[in-house]
């Protein structure tokens, strides 16, 4: 099928080459009409693809093929694929079939119990727990979790949905990616079934929608979601949404929809700090039954700074190679196995990128940021940039000083300590820091 090569090409641009070669290139795609089956040579690859890549594959295939229903199987693609027979009930009474299915759309693996809490996500975790315990409460309805990709927003959303179902097994909890909402609406329009589409959403107890930034520019989709939102909100049904940025920053979203999204609670999920990253690596290793020494977890946490998905990718690559080779996981083995991945991560966030991002954020010229002038409007952003360089790169203090117009390493050390101290009392500076971390991690 044509869509799979295009999907694979996009995945190659988003994930490390070694991961693509190990987990994605072996897959064979079969289009069965109502779904797409991806065949893997063994169950281990199926497990890795399901855990790490399946949500993104579904998004891309929905975009390229108009079909985000994807199944994984062990084996090889049949030479003469036959479409799956339609269930008799659907064939005889198509109008009775739900436009958007309820069953199986929540991943039960994601719970609050296996979510690793840290300073960067503790407010989001607390809000998701409250939404699950008191669904529909105006204090957190809607609950909007926003932040860069791979930080755990979907995990918290799934965990809240699973907790709702555990408390009330009869609860109708619907999880959708934004593209699925769009596709279901288009299908309802084509089938002249908009009344059924609207009625189905009115019958649920909680609606969870991922990546609402993709509603931008789709006027009819926003119109229908606006009315769906109002009906659920008025009925005190819980709404949980995720977005890759604060909704007011999303161009193409209607002002009235942005206003609705601000009614409840909006929480930023930030990149995890070092301690949280290390805890995540160790927790994910335990889930896989893998023995990971602390110093290896610290190595991965120190080098992989951007998001949880990258941490998991590094861990999975490490465990897979250890299984294939029979070697023990040591620091030396980790450095050897993850060499290209770590190099790419290091190159992604360099001092010039940090300087430009900070200068743009504070509305400064680069020459002013690097100048010898010490006015407060320049000194504070300069200190922030130095502290970010120390936090996000492997450069030494003298190297960072050289990059800032030849400043002494003691100046850099003072800047790092000053920013760390000020952030404890200055909420605005803490907010600036977290926003810059998010921008540099995108």
UniProtKB/Swiss-Prot annotation:
Residues 105-322 are annotated as: Domain III, AAA+ region. Belongs to the DnaA family. Domain I is involved in oligomerization and binding regulators, domain II is flexibile and of varying length in different bacteria, domain III forms the AAA+ region, while domain IV binds dsDNA. Keywords: ATP-binding, Cytoplasm, DNA replication, DNA-binding, Lipid-binding, Nucleotide-binding. Plays an essential role in the initiation and regulation of chromosomal replication. ATP-DnaA binds to the origin of replication (oriC) to initiate formation of the DNA replication initiation complex once per cell cycle. Binds the DnaA box (a 9 base pair repeat at the origin) and separates the double-stranded (ds)DNA. Forms a right-handed helical filament on oriC DNA; dsDNA binds to the exterior of the filament while single-stranded (ss)DNA is stabiized in the filament's interior. PANTHER family: CHROMOSOMAL REPLICATION INITIATOR PROTEIN DNAA. Residues 323-442 are annotated as: Domain IV, binds dsDNA. This is Chromosomal replication initiator protein DnaA. Oligomerizes as a right-handed, spiral filament on DNA at oriC. Residues 75-104 are annotated as: Domain II. ATP binds at residues 150, 152-154. Pfam families: Bac_DnaA, Bac_DnaA_C, DnaA_N. Residues 1-75 are annotated as: Domain I, interacts with DnaA modulators. The keyword Nucleotide-binding applies. GO terms for molecular function: ATP binding; ATP hydrolysis activity; DNA replication origin binding; lipid binding. It comes from the Bacteria. It comes from Xanthomonas campestris pv. campestris (strain ATCC 33913 / DSM 3586 / NCPPB 528 / LMG 568 / P 25). SUPFAM superfamilies: P-loop containing nucleoside triphosphate hydrolases (SSF52540), TrpR-like (SSF48295). It is found in: Cytoplasm. Its main location: cytoplasm.
């Amino acid at each position: 099928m044509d869509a799979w090569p295009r999907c694979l090409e996009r995945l190659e641009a988003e994930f490390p080459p070694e991961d693509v070669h190990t987990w994605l290139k072996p897959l064979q795609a079969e289009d069965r009409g109502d779904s797409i089956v991806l065949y893997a040579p063994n169950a281990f690859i199926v497990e890795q693809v399901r855990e790490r890549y399946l949500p993104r594959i579904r998004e891309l295939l929905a975009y390229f093929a108009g079909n985000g229903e994807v199944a994984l199987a062990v084996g090889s693609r049949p030479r003469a694929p036959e479409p799956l027979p339609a269930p008799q009930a659907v064939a005889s009474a198509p109008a009775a079939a739900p436009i958007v299915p309820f069953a199986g759309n929540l991943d039960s693996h994601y719970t609050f119990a296996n979510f690793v809490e840290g300073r960067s996500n503790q407010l989001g975790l607390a809000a998701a727990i409250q939404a699950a315990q008191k669904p529909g409460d105006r204090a957190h309805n809607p609950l909007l979790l926003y932040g860069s990709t791979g930080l755990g927003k979907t995990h918290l959303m799934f965990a809240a949905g699973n907790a709702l179902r555990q408390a009330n097994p009869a609860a109708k909890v619907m999880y959708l990616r934004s593209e699925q909402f769009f596709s279901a609406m288009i299908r309802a329009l084509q089938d002249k079934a908009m009344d059924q589409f609207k009625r189905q959403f009115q019958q649920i107890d909680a609606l969870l929608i991922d990546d609402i930034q993709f509603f931008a520019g789709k006027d009819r989709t926003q119109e229908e979601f606006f009315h769906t939102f109002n009906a659920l909100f008025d009925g005190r049904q819980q709404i949980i949404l995720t977005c890759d940025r604060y909704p007011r920053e999303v161009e193409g979203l209607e002002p009235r929809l942005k206003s609705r999204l601000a009614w409840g609670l909006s929480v930023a999920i930030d990149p995890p700090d070092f301690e949280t990253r290390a805890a995540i690596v160790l927790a994910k290793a335990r889930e896989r039954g893998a023995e990971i020494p602390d110093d290896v977890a610290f190595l991965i946490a120190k080098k992989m700074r951007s998001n949880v998905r990258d941490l998991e990718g590094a861990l999975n690559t490490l465990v897979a190679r250890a299984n294939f080779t029979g070697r023990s996981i040591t620091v030396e083995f980790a450095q050897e196995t993850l060499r290209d991945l770590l190099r790419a991560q290091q190159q992604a966030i360099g001092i010039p990128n940090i300087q430009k991002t900070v200068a743009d954020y504070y509305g400064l010229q680069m020459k002013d940021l690097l100048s010898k002038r010490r006015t407060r409007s320049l000194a504070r952003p300069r200190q922030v940039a130095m502290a970010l360089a120390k936090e996000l790169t492997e450069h030494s203090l003298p190297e960072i000083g050289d990059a800032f117009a030849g400043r002494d390493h003691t100046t850099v050390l003072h800047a790092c300590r000053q920013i760390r101290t000020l952030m404890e009392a200055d909420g605005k500076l803490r907010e600036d820091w977290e926003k810059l971390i998010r921008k540099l991690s995108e």
